[in-house]
Amino acid sequence: MAPLAALASSMLLLLWLVAPSRACTCVPPHPQTAFCNSDLVIRAKFVGAPEVNHTTLYQRYEIKTTKMFKGFDALGHATDIRFVYTPAMESVCGYSHKSQNRSEEFLIAGQLRNGLLHITTCSFVVPWNSLSFSQRSGFTKTYAAGCDMCTVFACASIPCHLESDTHCLWTDQLLLGSDKGFQSRHLACLPQEPGLCAWQSLRPRKD
C-alpha cells in the first residue's frame, strides 16, 4: 500500500478510536448548489449490501444507474457507474444507506476520484420520489444553466447582504429552520442578463 494511503487510513482509524461518538455535521445545500458543486449527478438504485475494505476504511455500495444528469465528460470512456464509495464510519462522514427497498430510485450527487464515485453524509442523496416537480426539472436540465454564472447565497443571520449581483439570497434555513422550504423546492438561481442572476420559479404554469 502506498505511504500516503497508509497514512490516510491510519488517520481515519485514529479519529474513529478517539472520538467514536462525535457525529459528522453539515448544512444541507440548496439542490442547485449540490448539482453545481458535484462532479457526477445520477439517478440510481442501491442494489447491494455495503462491502467494507478494512485496509482503506472505505465501504462501497453496488448501484444500478438509471439516468445520468451530469458527469458525461468527467467519466471519460467509462460507460457506467456500478459502485458508490464512502468512508466506512459515520463519525468521519460515512454515508449509511437506510432504505431496504432495492427498487427505490435515489438522486445521488457526488465527487469523482480516480474514476470512482464518492459520497459522504453531507452529499445530496435523496429518494427521487421525494423531490418536487421543480427539483426534478432542475436536476434534469435547468440547474446547469446557472452553474457558471450564478450562486445560491445562504443567509446565516439577519441582516443578510448579497456580495454580488450574481448571487440569489437563500433564506429557507434562517426563516424556516429547514432546507426544504419554498426556495429549495421550487426556485432556481438563473442568469437574467449579463452580470445579473435572480430566482426563477420552476413550477409548471397553470393554463
From Swiss-Prot:
Species whose genome carries this gene: Oryctolagus cuniculus (Rabbit)
Disulfides per UniProt: C24-C93, C26-C122, C36-C147, C150-C197, C155-C160, C168-C189
Keywords from the named record: Disulfide bond, Glycoprotein, Growth factor, Metal-binding, Metalloenzyme inhibitor, Metalloprotease inhibitor, Phosphoprotein, Protease inhibitor, Secreted, Signal, Zinc
Binding partners and assembly: Interacts with MMP1, MMP3, MMP10 and MMP13, but has only very low affinity for MMP14. Interacts with CD63; identified in a complex with CD63 and ITGB1.
Family: Belongs to the protease inhibitor I35 (TIMP) family.
Region (Involved in metalloproteinase-binding): 24-27, 90-91
Gene Ontology molecular function terms on file: cytokine activity; growth factor activity; metal ion binding; metalloendopeptidase inhibitor activity; protease binding
Site (Involved in metalloproteinase-binding): N37
Binding site for Zn(2+): C24
GO CC, any one term: extracellular space
Domain of life of the organism encoding this protein: Eukaryota
Subcellular location(s) per record: Secreted
Stated name of the protein: Metalloproteinase inhibitor 1
Domain NTR: 24-147
Recorded name of the encoding gene: TIMP1
Function: Metalloproteinase inhibitor that functions by forming one to one complexes with target metalloproteinases, such as collagenases, and irreversibly inactivates them by binding to their catalytic zinc cofactor. Acts on MMP1, MMP2, MMP3, MMP7, MMP8, MMP9, MMP10, MMP11, MMP12, MMP13 and MMP16. Does not act on MMP14. Also functions as a growth factor that regulates cell differentiation, migration and cell death and activates cellular signaling cascades via CD63 and ITGB1. Plays a role in integrin signaling.
Signal peptide: 1-23
Glycosylation sites: N53, N101
GO biological process, one term: negative regulation of endopeptidase activity
PROSITE patterns per record: NTR, TIMP
PANTHER family documented for this protein: METALLOPROTEASE INHIBITOR, METALLOPROTEINASE INHIBITOR 1
Modified-residue entries (Phosphoserine), positions: S178
Post-translational modification, as annotated: The activity of TIMP1 is dependent on the presence of disulfide bonds. N-glycosylated.
